[in-house]
């Protein structure tokens, strides 16, 4: 199965997919730089009178609901409609949907305008969308339960898409297949934007590789490996230094590293 992950990385480097991102103001620069680091081409286009047409030119669409304004909400409806009409992968990052009821209503409406290819959130967000009790604090998940796989599979079947829940162990499921990614570092929780960057990477990989399940696993593994390497560099235990090293290490993840250090449990 690791062969699929290396093929996904190769496809990303070869195709340089254009990722149309409508994301939050806190992490927009982080998302753009992470995409550039792995070889994708980010476009942070969110003007409502531009997104319908632009989404149809992209390799994938990334919708991040972190600081959702009314203008972004309208743009997201138009963008997902355009992307779905062209069969372009749509990646949803349902930031804070477990804490803010409006987010769940927005996600439901987005589902009327188009379809999701991947839903990527933390465990609390995934459980909230799946209709399960979730422990959250703002945008952060307090859940570390053993029902994460069940929540992912349930949500995947409900939406007919791939679902990924990030945490100490990342879970990826599509209603039939599932895996656990055991790489990563606590340092990723000490900077703003790691989750958003991971979501952006999922969009990048999905824009280059047809198997959305494999693309999602490859993206999250890339993020986790880069985090491990960033922590291991000089000063990597300091949040500011770690952030800078993280972007550097994203650019250095290759097939050999995935083969050597990737810890993926296929279920």
UniProtKB/Swiss-Prot annotation:
InterPro entries: Hyethyz_kinase (IPR000417), Ribokinase-like (IPR029056). Its cofactor is Mg(2+). Its EC number is 2.7.1.50. The keyword Isomerase does not apply. The keyword Heme does not apply. Belongs to the Thz kinase family. This is Hydroxyethylthiazole kinase. It comes from Desulfitobacterium hafniense (strain DSM 10664 / DCB-2).
